[in-house]
Amino acid sequence: MQIVSVDIGSTWTKAALFAREGDALTLVNHVLTPTTTHDLAKGFFSSLNLVLNVDNALPLFNNGEVALKYSSSAKGGLAVAAMGLVPSITLETAKVTAHSAGAKIAQYYSYKLNRRDIQALEETQPDILLFTGGTDGGEESYGLNNARVLAESKLDCAIIYAGNRDIQDEVQEILGHKDLTIVDNVLPDLDHPNPLAARQAICDIFLKRIVKGKGLDVVVDKTGEEPMPTPWTVFELVKAISNVDHSWKEFMLIDMGGATTDVYSACANTLSPDTVLHGVPEPFVKRTVEGDLGMRVSAMVVGESAKELVNVNFAQQPAQLDAFYHYLRHLVAHPDYLPANAEEKYFDTVLAGLCVGYATERHAGTKKEVCTCVGNVDLQMGRDLTTVRKVVGSGGWLSRASPFDMHHWLKYRELNDDGKRILLPTEFEYYRDSRGLLPLLANVARVDPLAAARTSIQCLTL
């Protein structure tokens, strides 16, 4: 059996043809073409024809000779506004849920919505508003207040209510005239997050409503196959890899693009002795996405946000500092630009390191010693990745860059701005997705997760 996998990115559309025999996958062909943002279908079908070396690939899919799976993060991906009650509890659970569904958080709100919040939502119009807050049987007034405020707003996006089940009927009555979906609470009680129903609802809305807005309805009509958000498929691949090979049970994957940096980790919620967890337990597999950390479109934002670290990095070469910022401004104006000399290659390395460092810092948990009535204890928020022994770099620059000192950039900041220890991997092997196959194998995992996971491990380069 042959499987074609296509991933439509913001800049490039990647396609691969795999031959499947039993539990083994063999790469037959692999092509890269520019994404036709004005008409995604045009570039998509061009990639299909190229990877299959035919003039018209559609008959091969229609008669069952070749299977097709594809994903997309083009045109900004899936933008979700997350709303919860307490920032470190229900709001954090809402953000984790949205990220696991392949979305990026466009905005987030806690407690009661005010006039400025509503104005911001109306102006940006996210694809979906994930409305959470309150455990089952818990706080009701904030959720009801926010429902009434939303009902009077001009917000026109899909709304998923995944909060306190005790007010589901009232929320339905208040927001019934909106595009409303009600699902199980993402946090029915403080010890048991429940993201699955909301995650599936986000995916369903992506397929029913957003595919057309992203210009993929033509592809669906002609192929009969529906796309998935690229980060969703990669998230599922991370789970499959963790399940298929014990030596890969726990690992971290960094997927860095021109505009964003995604971080995935598979890691158990373990606490070291004399450590207390603050907040909600995290899922075994977690994804975060940083919309301000990227190698091209977001380059200047990275440079401004990380000025202190930039100054430290160029302390021995102060003359290069102005040249570095000039280079970043050039990248923003010309996102397709590739470095032309050794200095610019070095600047790219520094920029990549800053993206990696900050994205992983925001993904990882933190720990700080506090004094209690029973003595000093470590207060931990989030996940402890210090025992993770494998880190993978993917995405255009990280896939190509060899060598890249991942160890240096993960330990560049041991403490965050609040003086808390950042719980990132310390001793690990660094692997590269050198051929950029992971997003493509993630699509294949929808057909055969076992074979896709094994092939993913085999294709990595130390």
Predicted segments — roles?
Residues 261, 265-268, 298, 361-368, ...:
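Hydrophobic alpha-helix feature that most strongly marks membrane-spanning transmembrane helices
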Residues 304-369:
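A glycine- and small/hydrophobic-rich beta-loop-beta segment
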Residues 13-19, 80, 256, 261-266:
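Short beta-strand scaffold segments in enzyme catalytic cores
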Residues 24-27, 286-288, 330-338, 416-422:
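Short acidic (Asp/Glu) and glycine-rich catalytic loops that position anionic groups and cofactors
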Residues 239, 246-319, 403-427:
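Glycine-rich phosphate-binding loop of actin/hexokinase-like ATP-binding domains
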Residues 1-5, 21-24, 28-38, 42-45, ...:
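Nucleotide/phosphate-binding catalytic cleft detector across ATP-hydrolyzing
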Residues 8-12:
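Short polar catalytic/cofactor-binding loops
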